[in-house]
């Protein structure tokens, strides 16, 4: 019974740490770039897009398709960086718990 209570206490602590980590992830901001920095996407580590910046040289009617491609690439770059930041935080949180690799608590 003591083991069960210990597990419940550990689960409650983990839940508290997860809430704190979610708040930290909201504060982490990454920036994805494409076109040599002509297009930038800012995103939180919670995968929320915070802003998009487009160099004025790209805002031409005949450059629309290029701009769309660059936006998609910048978003993908920001998403990868946000995912890496989230994984880093999750590893720090769950590293001492002895969980099997790839459990996927994130």
Curated annotation (Swiss-Prot):
Gene3D superfamilies named among the record's database cross-references: Nucleoid-associated protein YbaB-like domain
Entry's localization field: Cytoplasm, Nucleoid
Chief subcellular location: cytoplasm
One Pfam match: YbaB_DNA_bd
SUPFAM superfamilies xrefs: YbaB-like
Keyword Cell cycle: no
GO CC aspect terms: bacterial nucleoid; cytosol
Keyword Hydrolase: no
InterPro entries named in the record: YbaB-like_sf, YbaB/EbfC
GO MF assignments: DNA binding
Function noted in UniProt: Binds to DNA and alters its conformation. May be involved in regulation of gene expression, nucleoid organization and DNA protection.
Assembly description: Homodimer.
Similarity comment text for this entry: Belongs to the YbaB/EbfC family.
Protein name per UniProt: Nucleoid-associated protein RPA0616
Organism: Rhodopseudomonas palustris (strain ATCC BAA-98 / CGA009)
Source lineage: Bacteria, Pseudomonadati, Pseudomonadota, Alphaproteobacteria, Hyphomicrobiales
């Amino acid at each position: 019974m003591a083991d069960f209570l210990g597990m419940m206490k550990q689960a409650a602590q983990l839940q508290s740490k997860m809430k704190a980590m979610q708040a930290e992830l909201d504060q982490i901001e990454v920036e994805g770039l494409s076109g040599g920095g002509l297009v930038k996407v800012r995103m939180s580590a919670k995968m929320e897009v915070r802003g998009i910046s487009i160099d004025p040289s790209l805002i031409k009617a005949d450059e629309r398709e290029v701009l769309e491609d660059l936006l998609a690439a910048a978003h993908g770059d920001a998403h990868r960086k946000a995912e890496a930041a989230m994984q880093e935080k999750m590893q720090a949180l769950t590293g001492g718990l002895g969980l099997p690799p790839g459990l996927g608590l994130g």
